[in-house]
């Protein structure tokens, strides 16, 4: 009995799987879409942060800091000092 490998003369049947360079499978497309969504969220957050840094007081309503100051001046928050 010989231990040498011999090639069969008949051709191999074509594979039923996708070709090697055909594209992305389902898991890769899902990961790609998820990463793309994360990048979009990151860009939106960066734009928002830059806009806040450039003009921080335009995003703050005037009533949130003027009313609070008036309340402190009226002495309504004396219990907070205890």
UniProtKB/Swiss-Prot annotation:
InterPro entries given in the database record: Cortexin (IPR020066)
Region span, Disordered: 1-20
Keyword field: Membrane, Transmembrane, Transmembrane helix
Major place of residence: membrane
Membrane topology recorded in Swiss-Prot or TrEMBL: Single-pass membrane protein
Disulfide bonds: none
Transmembrane segments: 30-50
Annotated compartments: Membrane
One GO cellular component term: membrane
Function: May mediate extracellular or intracellular signaling of cortical neurons during forebrain development.
Similarity remark: Belongs to the cortexin family.
Protein name: Cortexin-1
């Amino acid at each position: 009995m010989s231990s040498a490998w011999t090639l069969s003369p008949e051709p191999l049947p074509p594979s039923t799987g996708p070709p090697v360079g055909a594209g992305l499978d389902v898991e890769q497309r899902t990961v790609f879409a998820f990463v793309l969504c994360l990048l979009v969220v990151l860009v939106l957050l960066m734009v928002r942060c830059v806009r806040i840094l450039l003009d921080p007081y335009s995003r703050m309503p005037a009533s949130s800091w003027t009313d609070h100051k008036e309340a402190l001046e009226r002495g309504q928050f004396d219990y907070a000092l205890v």
